[in-house]
UniProtKB/Swiss-Prot annotation:
NCBIfam families with a match to the protein in the record: PFKA_ATP, PRK03202.1
Active site: 128 (proton acceptor)
Physiological role: Catalyzes the phosphorylation of D-fructose 6-phosphate to fructose 1,6-bisphosphate by ATP, the first committing step of glycolysis.
Domain of life assignment: Bacteria
Family label: Belongs to the phosphofructokinase type A (PFKA) family. ATP-dependent PFK group I subfamily. Prokaryotic clade 'B1' sub-subfamily.
Annotated positions binding Mg(2+): 104
Name the UniProt record assigns to this protein: ATP-dependent 6-phosphofructokinase
GO biological process, any: canonical glycolysis
Amino acid sequence: MIKKIGVLTSGGDSPGMNAAIRGVVRAGLSEGLEVYGIYDGYLGLFQDRIAKLDRYSVSDMINRGGTFLGSARFPEFREEGTRAIAIENMTKRGLDALVVIGGDGSYMGAKRLTEMGFPCIGLPGTIDNDVAGTDYTIGYFTALETVVEAIDRLRDTSTSHQRISIVEVMGRYCGDLTMAAAIAGGCEFIVLPEVEFKPEDLVYEIKAGIAKGKKHAIVAITEYICNVAELAQYIEKETGRETRATVLGHIQRGGRPVAYDRILASLMGAYSIELLLQGYGGRCVGVQNERLVHHDIVDAIENMKRPFRSNILETAKKLF
């Protein structure tokens, strides 16, 4: 029977992680469990930086961005010997299970711990919305608000100067954040990792817009597709229109979480406790069709793929 659990945040931070930690702690305490926080993710787990949390440890945390437990990249966790030390640090404190909040890399760590006999539950915490087994991840909607606000501001100055603006959005190899922000921000063009990109095709579309009398434009593009500064130079050369690139960067990860992220994080945190008390381990939590669900974490990592919603992209193109 589970009596003590740990909770950590790992990988890139996202708004709502604190709300998720709070959900785990408050729900766990209400069920009579002891809850321990691990500082700086898997690195802190390896270094034995573990502390007991009470309900006051998470007071006034639901509205704060980032993660008060901290997060760190720790590639050495791939090594079995490193994980064995981490498990030893948990077992000597009497911990029975671990809740991991993070993206697919964090899930991989939880998967490996589970395979070594230590039960874990994963919660999807990333602005990229690229985790399998869930429609939305914790932090996605807050990041979306941040990106849309930036696009709105860029449109003001682009309109004033009759300029083309390129805005680079996070997402790694998932275009969800870019596509949603482009629709909400009224961007004229979208460049996504799921769709083959040729700069000359984009220039053709921009020229077509100019021919119709378009005096400015916003191009939303997901990171890692190309060098946006070089793309801006190419567009300016080919169209004769002043073109500027803006990389939003890590500002997208910060800020007070919006209401939906707070609710999603709180419900997922509490649900992880329910699953552990029911004897589940090696699961990851998600929300699908507005319902909380859970999947085998190994299956989620190895077999489940997030579907690309091409129908939304096609609809978006009709709105430009």
